[in-house]
Amino acid sequence: MALKKAPKLFKTFFHWKLWKFSIIVFVFLVFLFLLQREVGVQDFKDEAGIEPVVGKKSHVLGLVLNAMNNIKGAKPKMQIKAPIRQTKVPGERHCLPGHYTPVELKPFLDRPLQDPNAPGASGKAFKTINLNSEEQKEKQAGEEKHCFNAFASDRISLHRDLGPDTRPPECIEQKFKRCPPLPTTSIIIVFHNEAWSTLLRTVHSVMYTSPAILLKEIILVDDASVDEYLHDKLDEYVKQFQIVKVVRQKERKGLITARLLGASVATGETLTFLDAHCECFYGWLEPLLARIAENPVAVVSPDIASIDLNTFEFSKPSPYGHSHNRGNFDWSLSFGWESLPKHENKRRKDETYPIRTPTFAGGLFSISKDYFEYIGSYDEEMEIWGGENIEMSFRVWQCGGQLEIMPCSVVGHVFRSKSPHTFPKGTQVITRNQVRLAEVWMDEYKEIFYRRNTEAAKIVKQKTFGDISKRIDLRQRLQCKNFTWYLSNVYPEAYVPDLNPLFSGYLKNIGNRMCLDVGENNHGGKPLIMYSCHGLGGNQKELCLHASKGPVQLRECTYKGQKTFAVGEEQWLHQKDQTLYNEALHMCLTGNGEHPSLASCNPSDPFQKWIFGQND
């Protein structure tokens, strides 16, 4: 009897085990479906969203585990644990390991093939020679209007390429990590009565060289242009590119306000500002955005190449690298360039390393949008243009950020010898802007600037530089460092004049009643001249009076700041008898003749007597 029932019992037991196994599989599949749905729909954009999601997952897991463990006799028992999630940094996006591939960094648009013999092809010069009378008139009109050869630009393709990638090998071979991911960017281009060809070549250049996954949009900000072709015609042209938008200021407010308008409508994670007459070289964008991903408080500029204003030849980078420059400032608060100090060259291992710069030109740079807003964007009370780049340079460094130049990022720019634009209220707005930055950021060192610029001193005395209380509050809120810290830590090479000098101002000769003057286009290495005293200041080149047996010359000062010394030829004694005595050559300065020179000291000679006078 027992033997007859055995097959039936075995069959019943087998069905029971199969039933339990089916339940296990079903419950496990339900668990996977719920878990996948939770992961798929939840976008981990901020830390606040992590806890509820993890809680939901834990609840689902608990139900599943309890159900499975309550099924007695199920073998083997299954132990399921939720995957351990790594701690998430606020603001960090989900990213994959490894590096971006060339396919992932494919440009937004493919550049059309060009005729290698076309005007300006491959970035070559287009020389306008043998023009007929009509062409000559057109060329002259373009130069007068735009201060560059618009005739040449108009005949160069909007789509021209720049030939082979001639950057150093480490730039061409540079890989970019997927984690943290490269941020998206909004390109902001401000224009006012810009030439059609230079503006549109800038736009096309961006689209042909910027990865599609990084290029969020191109925002063209019209600062009240009056040229008709920049209105409906421009709007119609950019309709073919959904990524390009035009916003307009109804009245001329200048670069600063226009950039703030562009930033206010931008949706990218970073902002990239370009001028309206640029061309971007291969791989220009990735190094800028990679540096911001690595250091969100870095404000980064490309290596700016020159586009010749006459021929539009693009000065391409060298594959062997080259000596770089960085930004500086003088005590007239003008921007300039200088070669890198030895310690900065030593710090950098190759061309992929950023260059730290005390100031930046301010026309071409990228910055995190969040950081741009946090650090105070631009001073909204500054007018039109001028001084905003020096102000931002001081502010970024003093408030915990840093300015850098990325040599592997190359952007060409048409450098003009003068501006084609007039400014409402004239150039006084620039001086007013400079006074605002000096009052907020320079502490006691602002007095050096006021001694150099009589117009600035008047603005301060009359208190016509506007309300700066918001900018002072910003400095206090961000707990920014003082200007002494900036000079000591960011720019120790700067020449800092005495805060309380024994003498300052113009240097007037008693004999001819004329003043010592730099003269035109004297950037060092040329003699000085005697010129009618005007008391306007200007021409402050941070150069030194260098004694020699012929006419004395202006030369680059051997005194460079801390731990440096001036050579004897640049050390002068203003003696009680009003002579200027050079100890190295034991001679005195005379103003007799076309150029000041040295002569045997004669205290009775009125041409050897000099007095300092304050600028009016």
Swiss-Prot record:
PROSITE patterns: RICIN_B_LECTIN. GO terms for molecular function: carbohydrate binding; manganese ion binding; polypeptide N-acetylgalactosaminyltransferase activity. This is Polypeptide N-acetylgalactosaminyltransferase 3. GO terms for cellular component: Golgi cisterna membrane. Its EC number is 2.4.1.41. The keyword tRNA-binding does not apply. It is a single-pass type II membrane protein. Residues 512-616 form the Ricin B-type lectin domain. Pathway: Protein modification; protein glycosylation. It comes from Taeniopygia guttata (Zebra finch). It catalyses: L-seryl-[protein] + UDP-N-acetyl-alpha-D-galactosamine = a 3-O-[N-acetyl-alpha-D-galactosaminyl]-L-seryl-[protein] + UDP + H(+); L-threonyl-[protein] + UDP-N-acetyl-alpha-D-galactosamine = a 3-O-[N-acetyl-alpha-D-galactosaminyl]-L-threonyl-[protein] + UDP + H(+). GO terms for biological process: protein O-linked glycosylation via threonine. There are two conserved domains in the glycosyltransferase region: the N-terminal domain (domain A, also called GT1 motif), which is probably involved in manganese coordination and substrate binding and the C-terminal domain (domain B, also called Gal/GalNAc-T motif), which is probably involved in catalytic reaction and UDP-Gal binding. Belongs to the glycosyltransferase 2 family. GalNAc-T subfamily. Its main location: Golgi. Catalyzes the initial reaction in O-linked oligosaccharide biosynthesis, the transfer of an N-acetyl-D-galactosamine residue to a serine or threonine residue on the protein receptor. Glycosylates FGF23. Disulfide bonds join 515-533, 588-601. Glycans are attached at residue 482. Residues 182-291 are annotated as: Catalytic subdomain A.
